[in-house]
């Protein structure tokens, strides 16, 4: 017990190094798909940090993630959304299993997110509306738009009727600035 403070310093030092290693590995994992994200962002005129934040929230960068309603891959796409992308991209050989491919999934997800954003161009900031549509569907978003929430994104976020969708939108909007530096 004479050197308890030395053991304490050693333990603190090792835990600090573990935290640094964990942060480095996480950053490396989060950057793994940056090239694909940039390609999708350029193709569909989206901010790459937004796409990356959606991937972070939807799948935590797990290409094999599957959702409760059958959503697949990095951006957690449904078959219907993916087939819509494939039709628009004139891909005749598309199959839902292709959604496990990071490039295919990210391109399809970016297409769908850009489509959602285009539906709200009259708003001061269409991104929260697009994210809510991506998560809960456009019909839900149209129900939540009321009064000043029709065009004011801050008011709209407060009017989102599903707590999980409100948290989803807020989490992505908080995370997006953290990913900005990855694309500068």
Task: Show which residues each predicted segment covers.
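Alpha-helical scaffolds flanking conserved acidic
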Residues: 47-52, 125-132
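Substrate-binding/active-site groove segments that recognize
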Residues: 69-92, 107-112, 151
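Cell-wall polysaccharide-cleaving catalytic domain and substrate-binding groove, primarily
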Residues: 56-81, 137
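Second-shell loop/turn segments in exported
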Residues: 23-27, 37-40, 63-72, 91-103, ...
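Export/targeting segments at the very N-terminus of extracytoplasmic proteins
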Residues: 14-64, 86, 91, 103, ...
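N-terminal Sec-pathway targeting helices
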Residues: 1-20
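Short glycine/serine- and small hydrophobic-enriched flexible loop segments
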Residues: 56, 111-118
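Catalytic and substrate-binding regions of cell-wall glycan-acting enzymes that process beta-1,4-linked
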Residues: 129-184
